[in-house]
A protein has these predicted regions:
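Terminal hydrophobic membrane-targeting helix
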Residues: 1-31
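Short, structural beta-strand-to-alpha-helix junction motif
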Residues: 14-15, 39-40, 111
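Acidic helix-start/capping segments at beta-turn-to-alpha-helix junctions
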Residues: 1-2, 36-41, 78-79
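Primarily a LysM-type cell-wall glycan-binding module
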Residues: 30-50
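Flexible glycine-/small-residue-rich
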Residues: 11, 36, 108
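Short acidic, gly/pro-rich beta-turn/loop elements at beta-sheet edges
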Residues: 17-19, 42, 114
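Bacterial extracytoplasmic/cell-wall-associated proteins, especially those involved in peptidoglycan
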Residues: 45, 49-53, 57, 62-284
Length: 284
């Protein structure tokens, strides 16, 4: 029988899970929200520059706010988890990219490992729902490679927080175009050339971002993919890599007007920079 009480329902829960919780009563619960584009750790460089440099979207920060200690969090980051999600995850790699952005509900006695296991189970449902393993394979990518490219797309352009369906869909079409560029460059053994990867490398090292930072994560300096994802991709960026835009573009820029401009050749790309990217492109 259903017990009286207040239950907070997470979007990721199935009907059976909801009914089971209502039958057992809901109490001592906690709500934890993770974010698309979030990373496991806050930027060491930003944190060293000011007391307000902590990234409030980082997984560690969010888990701290939920009442867990740094030791509990660190141990959970190193723990082993049972999920088909990790079938092709390289041995020894971190959990970067797997803490799927969503709002989750937990009992008060849930451990950090319980929290992360629930998150991974939910992410695998997203993988299954969108048939990502097969769709990535059709692009010549493993699940881990697709996840890694999607994380770069996410940091280049996040779409999950767009306020209207129309704006979110327009943003998603840009994500598909960006995914097409990165996949094409990867297949041609070209450097991906993504600025967000050297920024991630600098954040991990605790140094000021520089385009020539010597790190395997810096795709402006090294060919191939970074060793791991650089953030948690949202569902839209995952779908963008699974179904990239048609075409053979090899370049893109974010213009000063907020639009994305694509090009097939270096000459076209330089023309786009001259026309549309005087401010933003001078920063790097």
């Amino acid at each position: 029988s259903i017990k009286a009480g207040t239950c907070m329902i997470a979007p990721s829960e199935s009907v059976a899970e909801i009914v089971n919780r209502m039958n057992n009563g809901c109490h001592d619960s906690k709500t934890i929200t993770f974010y698309p584009g979030g990373t496991l750790e806050s930027s060491k460089y930003k944190a060293s520059q000011s007391s307000s440099g902590v990234d409030k979207t980082s997984v560690r920060y969010i888990l701290r706010q939920a009442g867990y200690s740094d030791d509990e969090i660190s141990n959970a980051f190193k723990a082993k988890y049972d999920s088909p999600l990790f079938a092709d995850r390289p041995s020894g790699s971190s959990l970067e990219g797997y803490v799927f952005g969503e709002t989750y509900q937990f009992t008060g006695d849930a451990t950090v490992k319980d929290v992360l296991q629930t998150v991974f189970d939910h992410m695998y449902k997203v993988v299954q729902k969108n048939d990502l393993v097969n769709k990535f394979k059709a692009q010549g990518l493993t699940l881990y490679q697709g996840l890694t490219i999607a994380s770069i797309v996410e940091r280049e352009l996040g779409c999950e927080d767009k306020p209207t369906v129309e704006r979110k869909n327009r943003c998603y079409q840009y994500q598909r175009g960006i995914a097409q560029v990165f996949i094409a460059r990867y297949k041609k053994n070209m450097q991906l050339g993504s600025d967000v990867t050297f920024i991630y490398a600098a954040d991990k090292a605790g140094v000021k971002p520089k385009v020539d930072i010597d790190s395997p994560y810096n795709t402006r300096k090294h060919t191939g993919l970074p060793p791991t994802p650089i953030a948690t991709p949202g569902e839209l960026s995952l779908k963008a890599v699974a179904d990239p835009a048609p075409g053979d573009n090899l370049f893109f820029i974010a213009g000063d007007d907020g639009l994305i401009y694509f090009a097939k050749t270096d000459e076209e790309h330089k023309n786009n920079i001259d026309k549309y990217c005087q401010k933003l492109c001078s920063i790097v």
